[in-house]
């Protein structure tokens, strides 16, 4: 296990960590109040105005590198301190370079003593903060490698004092390469091996205490417990990398405000998909709407760059609870609520798509791929209330390795105006553009839905996934859905036809594509076909109304809804660059063959054939040809006649 280096500067909204936190504390249920073990010593911060006014800082000699300037500032500020440069220094998009230093004493880290220096574009000190210790340093302890009994005893003390669900009766300690650091073996109840490291800590009296920093990941909490070396029964402090994030949002499954009320929901991430949680990228833990999968903010001024500096809410306890009323007339007043909703919905969808196969290797959107393949460095910039225009939303998908951008606009077709971040279907629609563009033609090629027909199918996949996700437990194939009804203020929504299996409600067939020269009406036809396939599969396998699918031992979703979504997703990865309806249909059929051995060919073919994309359908630039036929032998050794397209199909097809 890699060691952790805390950087608990009160002036910063991030904490440097390595590894992944998990959510939801259980220690309170065991009678342990972790808040009583919080660190007591805050850092100081010198802002840019104070730096400019400080003559001593301005007289620091110009050096060859920003790192040298930062180092000189630390030396000048705390002349007698010993320290080391932490390896996570970087330059922000705004041109400010950030350097982090850890104070040491007698060759050991002082875990609560940090110094951060920010160097501006001009090479001068911009601002800085520090919590360096200024008192007397005790005599050095013996730093010879121990026999392992002390770190094991420290772990047992932490387990006893904090009532941790860990068994360490047979534990042994093995030295690691880092100074006075031990891996503790033969324990149970932890996600990974505990680690003990000898460090100093500033105690409640303001003096240096020599402690064992014991790291234990027990899933519900990821703890650093500082156990006194002399008095093993004393735990000076505890740091918990985990945090229960709370969001006041329309929960997953509520498509828009007409379907339910906002609620306070806690966390909600799926650890295999978001192994660092939603507010951590494996190196930094964020106290704002930022994490490995995305960063959400308002963009009222339509800025085209500098997204990291845009306004977003900050909460030390990750409690994102902001007021919102449907009667509010000024959308600026509920910007934080909009950001929170957008961040929540996008992260939920990221995790769902991961379970269906849109992972790191497939080109999903994450900053840190954590060794799982793909390029990384490409979360999604989530622009709430984007000021470019009204009545729209869009998603820009560059190749794998470059961040995507979602722009959600205010809609002015109602009074008061409406914010599309509060309609989950719109958020999911936009995010699905990232899915279809990354999968079609491979993650490195984002230009594979650039034809009119393939671009239209991109719109269709987005509508389809949004509609499938909003299905309710009581829904049957008789249920019709409108896309964008709430945001537009129109019962007809923003598409030509509702999504329906009733040909009287939605009569569209393949050749109707001929009349359109824009992608959205073409997408309406493609999604209508997928909606037919969806209900054929639901009628066969039932519908899972939970947030995530259940899979059988072969990796096949057990229900029809998630199976339809899985096949659509797998088909994207199989289909060629710039597919047609015909080739995309074939790819979905191939996806079923690959996943299930072709167990659902009748349901899939029947869904497409009902709307003219049967066996003999033809794509041509001069005009498309309908076919309402299912291949012979696919459905009970018979064909579905073209006459069947105007009547309800039997449940068996």
UniProtKB/Swiss-Prot annotation:
Residues excised as propeptide: 20-244
Residues binding Zn(2+): 429, 433
This protein's UniProt keywords: Glycoprotein, Hydrolase, Metal-binding, Metalloprotease, Protease, Secreted, Signal, Zinc, Zymogen
The gene coding this protein: MEP
Residues bearing glycans: 327, 336, 412, 636-637
Native source species: Pyrenophora tritici-repentis (strain Pt-1C-BFP)
Protein name, UniProt field: Extracellular metalloproteinase
A Gene Ontology BP annotation from the UniProt entry: proteolysis
Function of the molecule: Secreted metalloproteinase that allows assimilation of proteinaceous substrates.
Leader sequence segment: 1-19
Annotated family: Belongs to the peptidase M36 family.
GO molecular function annotations of the record: metalloendopeptidase activity; zinc ion binding
């Amino acid at each position: 296990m890699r060691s952790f280096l805390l950087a608990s500067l009160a002036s910063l909204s991030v904490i440097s960590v390595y590894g992944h936190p998990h959510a939801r504390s259980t220690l309170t249920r065991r009678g342990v109040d972790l808040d009583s073990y919080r660190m007591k010593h805050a850092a100081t911060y010198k802002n840019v105005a104070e730096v400019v006014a400080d003559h001593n800082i301005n007289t620091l000699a110009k050096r060859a590198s920003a790192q040298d300037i930062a180092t000189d500032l630390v030396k000048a500020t705390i002349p007698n301190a010993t320290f080391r440069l932490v390896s996570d220094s970087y330059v922000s998009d705004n041109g400010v370079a950030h350097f982090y230093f850890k104070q040491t004493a007698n060759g050991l880290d002082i875990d609560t003593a940090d110094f951060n220096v920010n160097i501006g574009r001009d090479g001068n000190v911009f601002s800085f903060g520090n919590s360096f210790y200024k008192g007397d340093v005790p005599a050095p302890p013996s730093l010879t490698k121990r026999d392992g009994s002390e770190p094991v005893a420290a772990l047992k003390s932490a387990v006893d004092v904090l009532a941790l669900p860990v068994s360490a009766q047979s534990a042994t300690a093995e030295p690691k390469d880092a100074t006075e650091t031990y891996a503790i073996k033969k324990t149970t109840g932890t996600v990974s091996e505990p680690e003990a490291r000898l460090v100093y800590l500033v105690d409640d009296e303001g003096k240096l205490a020599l402690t064992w920093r014991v790291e234990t990941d027990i899933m519900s909490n990821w703890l650093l417990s500082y156990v006194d070396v002399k008095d093993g029964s004393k735990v000076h402090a505890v740091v918990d990398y985990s945090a229960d994030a709370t969001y006041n949002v329309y929960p997953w499954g509520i498509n828009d405000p007409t379907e339910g009320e906002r609620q306070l929901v806690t966390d909600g991430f799926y650890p295999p998909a978001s192994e660092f949680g939603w507010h951590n990228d494996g190196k930094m833990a964020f106290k704002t709407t930022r994490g490995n999968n995305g960063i959400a903010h308002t963009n009222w001024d339509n800025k085209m760059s500098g997204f990291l500096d845009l306004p977003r809410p900050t909460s030390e306890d990750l409690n994102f609870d902001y007021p919102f009323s449907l009667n509010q007339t000024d959308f600026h007043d509920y910007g934080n609520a909009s950001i929170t909703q957008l961040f929540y919905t996008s992260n939920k969808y990221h995790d769902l798509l991961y379970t269906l196969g849109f992972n790191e290797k497939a080109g999903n959107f994450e900053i840190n791929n954590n060794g799982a393949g793909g390029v990384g460095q490409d979360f999604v910039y989530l622009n709430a209330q984007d000021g470019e225009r009204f009545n729209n939303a869009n998603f820009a998908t560059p190749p794998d390795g470059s961040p995507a951008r979602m722009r959600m606009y205010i809609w002015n077709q109602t009074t008061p105006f409406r914010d599309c971040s509060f309609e989950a279907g719109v958020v999911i629609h936009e995010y699905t553009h990232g899915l279809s563009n990354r999968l079609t033609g491979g993650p490195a090629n984002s230009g594979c839905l650039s034809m009119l027909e393939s671009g239209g199918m991109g719109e269709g996949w987005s509508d389809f996934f949004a509609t499938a996700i909003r299905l309710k437990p009581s829904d049957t194939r008789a249920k019709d859905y409108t896309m964008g009804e709430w945001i537009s203020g129109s019962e007809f929504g923003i598409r030509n036809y509702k999504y329906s299996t009733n040909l009287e409600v939605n009569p569209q067939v393949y050749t109707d594509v001929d009349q359109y020269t824009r992608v959205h009406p073409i997408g309406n036809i493609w999604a209508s076909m997928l909606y037919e396939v969806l209900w054929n599969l639901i009628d066969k396998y039932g519908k899972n109304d939970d947030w995530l699918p259940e899979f059988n031992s072969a990796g096949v979703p057990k229900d029809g809804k998630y199976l339809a979504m899985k096949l659509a997703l797998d088909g994207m990865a199989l289909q060629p660059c710039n597919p047609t309806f015909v080739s995309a249909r074939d790819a979905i059929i191939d996806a079923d063959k690959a996943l299930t051995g072709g167990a659902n060919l009748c349901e899939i073919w029947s869904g497409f054939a009902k709307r003219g994309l049967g066996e003999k359908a033809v794509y041509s630039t001069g005009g498309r040809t309908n076919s309402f036929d299912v291949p012979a032998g696919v459905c009970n050794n018979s064909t579905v006649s073209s006459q069947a397209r105007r009547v309800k199909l039997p449940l068996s097809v």
